[in-house]
């Protein structure tokens, strides 16, 4: 199945692909940090309450939500900007 994509569409898809790869890398980094932190805590015989972990996860969730919102806004702004450029080029050529 062949898809005919405009350069802008291809660029947006490439950016989403890169974002996906970056999020996967972030996930792996978080897992590694959690694992090393978990090992440190057990070696020091300290325990973290579930409430503390839950609060940290909520903070991370809020930050990720903000990043997602900013990304969506940036993509939307880029699409509008490109559309306006195309319209101005179209009106100038008439």
UniProtKB/Swiss-Prot annotation:
Entry keyword Cell cycle: yes
GO (cellular component) term, any one: mitotic spindle
Keywords, alphabetical: Cell cycle, Cell division, Centromere, Chromosome, Chromosome partition, Cytoplasm, Cytoskeleton, Kinetochore, Microtubule, Mitosis, Nucleus
Pfam family, one: DASH_Dad3
Origin superkingdom: Eukaryota
One annotated GO biological process: positive regulation of microtubule polymerization
Localization, UniProt: Nucleus; Cytoplasm, Cytoskeleton, Spindle; Chromosome, Centromere, Kinetochore; Chromosome
SUBUNIT field: Component of the DASH complex consisting of ASK1, DAD1, DAD2, DAD3, DAD4, DAM1, DUO1, HSK3, SPC19 and SPC34, with a stoichiometry of one copy of each subunit per complex. Multiple DASH complexes oligomerize to form a ring that encircles spindle microtubules and organizes the rod-like NDC80 complexes of the outer kinetochore. DASH complex oligomerization strengthens microtubule attachments. On cytoplasmic microtubules, DASH complexes appear to form patches instead of rings.
PANTHER family from the UniProt entry: DASH COMPLEX SUBUNIT DAD3
Family named by the database record: Belongs to the DASH complex DAD3 family.
Role played: Component of the DASH complex that connects microtubules with kinetochores and couples microtubule depolymerisation to chromosome movement; it is involved in retrieving kinetochores to the spindle poles before their re-orientation on the spindle in early mitosis and allows microtubule depolymerization to pull chromosomes apart and resist detachment during anaphase.
Note: Present with 468 molecules/cell in log phase SD medium.
Name of this chain's protein: DASH complex subunit DAD3
């Amino acid at each position: 199945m062949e898809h005919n994509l405009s350069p802008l569409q291809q660029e947006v898809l490439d950016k989403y692909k890169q974002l996906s790869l970056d999020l996967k890398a972030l996930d792996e980094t978080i897992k590694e940090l959690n694992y090393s932190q978990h090992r440190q805590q057990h070696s020091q015989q300290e325990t973290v309450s579930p409430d503390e972990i839950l609060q940290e996860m909520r903070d991370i969730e809020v930050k990720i939500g903000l990043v997602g919102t900013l990304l969506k806004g940036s993509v939307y702004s880029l699409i509008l900007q490109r559309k306006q450029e195309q319209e101005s080029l179209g009106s100038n050529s008439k």
